[in-house]
């Protein structure tokens, strides 16, 4: 099978959907079976009506048993399983309310003995059972987050002090989180075929089975700290749920790319402002997804959006094998012509080769 060439995709923030179309993203959007099916179908239809000329959405989108929010990429089931309160919103991603656990409470923290009995896991499994009973199969997944992201939500700002002064404590915390992530992932991936399309749906264009670890918070620690205290857990998760990829939305992905390579990464989501050439040098055979800046896109003219896209492609340089372009979480106010300029710029570089986008919308 020929690999797609220069896949490109976008994800719009819930506020964009809410302001344009009145769609809401309360808890029922995530867990009510009928609402899941209806809203995912409707979102695909709306994408086609607005951007069908770019390949987005589906004209006659079928009803499908998609278990997670793969058109917006949010969800915090691991945090919820480990006791965080989640605040759902009509026009935004869910908010995690940090637990700010004490040192004693962290030492007492354990992987739930019967994880399927936790309220959030019961809700997810019930959703999966009902959809599979109706359709005979399942698609999609629920974002599992990363060890560092969940650790901050559980411990709060004291986590950063612990990384220096209480490394035995963070070792315990990291182990509990990694095992919890795995316990969720192993119950999802065998039934849906994916476990991280909800982190960045661009992978549906080429390898939907990649397990992406979303290391959003690595911007706040050094590569040395990551290597010494977190890398082993990410690498372990990659061995349990292969193949392994990483999301790094910060502007310093190049500093961590050699460590990701050491962990066996086959995919890296490269944050805007990162040294793309250095990332490619560290991961010569991996897929790289080059991220545009959604804040810049919100006010960009078509010309500015095209220039930013050109800049990413130039920073990588030819050939663009195993290279993708995406812009994630674009908010209300982003101009349609800026989105079109992004896609048309990539299309000039792609030529007549297949982008994989229609495959992506069939799978995700």
Segments from the language model and where they lie:
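Active-site loop segments of alpha/beta catalytic cores
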Residues: 1-36, 42, 49-50, 67-70, ...
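A generic structural signal for short, solvent-exposed coil/turn residues
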Residues: 2, 59-60, 89, 100, ...
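Membrane helical hairpin/interfacial module
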Residues: 35-86
